[in-house]
Swiss-Prot record:
Organism from which the protein derives: Prochlorococcus marinus (strain MIT 9313)
Family as reported in the entry's similarity comment: In the N-terminal section; belongs to the pantothenate synthetase family. In the C-terminal section; belongs to the cytidylate kinase family. Type 1 subfamily.
Chain residue ranges for the region called Cytidylate kinase: 269-505
Residues holding beta-alanine: Q53
EC annotation from Swiss-Prot or TrEMBL: 6.3.2.1, 2.7.4.25
Active site: H25 (proton donor)
Annotated region (Pantoate--beta-alanine ligase), positions in chain: 1-268
Cellular localisation: Cytoplasm
GO cellular component labels: cytosol
Protein name (database record): Bifunctional pantoate ligase/cytidylate kinase
UniProt catalytic activity: (R)-pantoate + beta-alanine + ATP = (R)-pantothenate + AMP + diphosphate + H(+); CMP + ATP = CDP + ADP; dCMP + ATP = dCDP + ADP
Pfam families named among the record's database cross-references: Cytidylate_kin, Pantoate_ligase
Classification via InterPro entries: Cytidylate_kin (IPR003136), Cytidylate_kinase_dom (IPR011994), P-loop_NTPase (IPR027417), Pantoate_ligase (IPR003721), Pantoate_ligase/cytidylate_kin (IPR024894), Pantoate_ligase_C (IPR042176), Rossmann-like_a/b/a_fold (IPR014729)
Length: 505
C-alpha cells in the first residue's frame, strides 16, 4: 500500500468495503467520476472483513468472501486498484496491541448501535486505521448504512482528519430491496417476504408527506404479521440520531428485521418540503457567482434576492424617487411585478414591471443606493413576502443579507460567505472592468465597501448579521471552484443524496 500510494499523482478516493461486492458497491466506485470539476482521481477499493465489528454470535466466519469476483466487479466499475489487507497488515502485532476508538454513547444509543453493542466502536477503529494507511483525499461511503455514515462524519470532524466524506444514495435492486452482501443468504421465497421492509417504509414516507403521523407500532405489527422478526423500528433525528416525536425538517425512519437467519436494515427520510439553502454575507463576497454555480451543480432553483433589491432601486431612479424617502418609495411598490428566470446562457434574467434590468442593476449608480432602499421596512416586507412564496415548496438556494435570519430561518443549510474588504475591493474592480464601467482606485473601493458594511449591519430593519446556526466561510485565497466544493460538502452533511440527488449523478 505504501508503494502504491507513493506513486499516485492524482487525488485518491477511497471506498472501504468488506467484500462480497454488489451493484451498490459498484455505484460507489462509479460515482467518484462525478465528483466536482477537479482533476481525475484514483479510486482505491479495500476488501477487509473487519473482525472488530462482529459480535460473538454474528456471521464473521460465514460472511461471504469471493476476492476474484470482487476484483472483477471493482475493475468493471472503474476502480484503479483493489487492496485486500490481512488482519496483520491492518493491525501489526494484533488488534489488541492497538488503540481502540469509542463512539460517543448518544450516537449509538439507538438503531443498530443499541442492538449491536460495540459494533460501531469496531467500525470507527478500523476505518481510522485504514485512513491512516491509505491517506485518501476523499472517503466514499453509502447512505444505506446511515448511522455508520453519520458516526464516521463525526469522527472525521472531531479528530480533524484531512479527508472529505462523500455519501452515495442507497442503491436498490429492481424489486426495491436495498443492495446488501447479506441478500445472498435469502432464499427465493424469503426475498419476496423481505420486500415488505422497503415497501412499508416507502408507504409511511408517502403518508408522512400527506400529513399523516408515522405509526411505529403499526409498522412493527405489519412486518410481524408477514413473518419478519422486527429488531427495531424508530424515527430519529437524521443527524444526532435521537428519537423524535414532534415534527422536524428532516428525520430518519429506520428499521432492522430478520427474515429467517438474515438480518436486513433499511430506512427512508421524512421531510415536509424540499431543502432550502440560505447564503448570506456582505457585498462583494462573491455570493452571486458561487451561489449560481452551486445551484446549477445541485439542480436547485437560484433565488437572487440581491437582484430583487437592486431592481427596486433601479425603479426608484427611473421614477426620480428619493431613495431616502420611505413614503415615496412605497408608492412604486404598488402592483410591483418582479420576475427572476433562467436565461439560455445559464445566468438569471431579472425583469421588473416588464423591463429587462439584468445588466442595469449592476451599475455603480444602483450599487451606491441599494443599501438605502433595502433598509426601508416597506421594501423588505414586500420582497420578503415574495421570496417566501417562491420558497414554500423548497428546492432552492437564496443569497442576500438576511436570508438565514429573516427570509428562510428554517433553511437546512445556512452559510455566511465573506471575505476581507481588500479582497472584496479587488473582486469589485474586476467586475466593473468586465462590465465596461469605470474602475475607481482600490483604496476608494475598499472604503466604499466598509461603509456599505456599516450601513447594512446597523440598519434598523433586517440588518446584516450571521445567523447563530450558520457556518462562516471566509473565501480569501480560495478559487471559485474551491468555494463551490466546500458549499457542496456542507450541503451534503445536512441533506442526503436520497433526499436531493446531485444533478446528473
Amino acid at each position: 500500500m505504501h508503494q502504491w500510494r507513493k506513486h499516485q499523482q492524482s487525488s485518491v478516493h477511497f471506498v472501504p468495503t468488506m467484500g462480497a461486492l454488489h451493484r451498490g458497491h459498484g455505484q460507489l466506485i462509479k460515482s467518484v467520476h462525478g465528483f466536482g470539476r477537479l482533476q481525475p482521481a484514483a479510486v482505491l477499493v479495500s476488501v477487509f472483513v473487519n473482525p472488530l465489528q462482529f459480535g460473538p454470535a454474528e456471521d464473521f466466519d460465514s460472511y461471504p468472501r469471493d476476492l476474484e469476483a470482487d476484483c472483477e466487479l471493482a475493475s468493471r466499475s472503474g476502480a484503479s486498484a483493489l487492496w485486500a489487507p490481512s488482519v496483520d497488515q491492518v493491525f501489526p502485532g494484533g488488534a489488541s496491541s492497538h488503540f481502540r476508538i469509542q463512539v460517543p454513547s448518544h450516537l449509538q444509543a439507538h438503531l443498530c448501535g443499541a442492538s449491536r453493542p460495540g459494533h460501531f466502536d469496531g467500525v470507527v477503529t478500523v476505518v481510522a486505521r485504514l485512513l491512516a494507511l491509505v491517506r485518501p483525499e476523499v472517503l466514499v461511503l453509502g447512505e444505506k448504512d446511515w448511522q455508520q455514515l453519520v458516526i464516521l462524519r463525526h469522527l472525521v470532524a472531531q479528530l480533524g482528519l484531512p479527508v472529505r466524506v462523500h455519501g452515495i444514495a442507497t442503491v436498490r435492486d429492481d424489486d426495491g430491496l436495498a443492495c446488501s452482501s447479506r441478500n445472498r443468504y435469502l432464499m427465493t421465497q424469503q426475498r419476496q417476504q423481505a420486500l415488505a421492509l422497503p415497501q412499508l417504509l416507502a408507504r409511511a414516507a408517502r403518508e408522512s408527506q400527506d400529513g399523516r403521523a408515522v405509526d411505529l407500532a403499526g409498522l412493527r405489527c405489519a412486518w410481524e404479521q408477514l413473518g419478519l422478526e422486527v429488531e427495531y423500528v424508530e424515527k430519529v433525528d437524521a443527524f444526532n440520531l435521537q428519537p423524535l416525536h414532534a415534527g422536524r425538517k428532516l428525520c430518519l425512519l429506520a428499521a432492522a428485521v430478520r427474515c429467517g437467519e438474515t438480518r436486513l436494515i433499511d430506512h427512508t427520510f421524512l421531510m415536509s418540503r424540499q431543502p432550502i439553502v440560505a447564503i448570506d454575507g456582505p457585498a462583494g463576497a462573491g455570493k452571486s457567482t458561487v451561489t449560481r454555480a452551486f445551484a446549477e451543480r445541485l439542480g436547485l432553483l437560484y433565488l437572487d434576492t440581491g437582484a430583487m433589491y437592486r431592481a427596486v432601486t433601479w425603479l426608484t431612479q427611473q421614477h426620480d424617487v428619493d431613495p431616502h424617502d420611505p413614503v415615496a418609495v412605497k408608492t412604486i411598490l404598488e402592483n410591483l411585478e418582479l420576475e427572476l428566470e433562467p436565461s439560455q446562457s445559464g445566468a438569471q434574467t431579472v425583469r421588473i414591471n416588464g423591463h429587462d434590468v439584468t445588466e442595469a442593476i449592476r451599475s455603480p449608480e444602483v450599487t451606491s443606493s441599494v443599501s438605502v432602499v433595502a433598509a426601508h421596512g416597506c421594501v423588505r416586507k414586500a420582497l420578503t413576502a415574495q421570496q417566501q412564496r417562491m420558497g414554500v415548496r423548497g428546492g432552492l438556494v437564496a443569497e442576500g443579507r438576511d436570508i438565514g435570519t429573516a427570509v428562510f430561518p428554517d433553511a437546512e443549510l445556512k452559510v455566511f460567505l465573506t471575505a476581507s474588504p481588500a479582497e472584496r475591493a479587488r473582486r469589485r474592480a474586476l467586475d466593473l472592468d468586465n462590465r465596461g464601467f469605470p474602475v475607481p482606485d482600490l483604496a476608494e473601493l475598499e472604503t466604499q465597501i466598509e461603509e456599505r458594511d456599516r450601513m447594512d449591519s446597523t440598519r434598523e430593519v433586517a440588518p446584516l448579521r450571521q445567523a447563530e446556526d450558520a457556518t462562516e466561510l471566509i473565501s480569501d485565497g480560495m478559487t471559485i471552484e474551491e468555494v463551490i466544493e466546500t458549499l457542496i460538502d456542507l450541503f451534503r452533511v445536512q441533506v442526503p443524496e436520497e433526499v436531493w440527488p446531485t444533478a446528473g449523478r
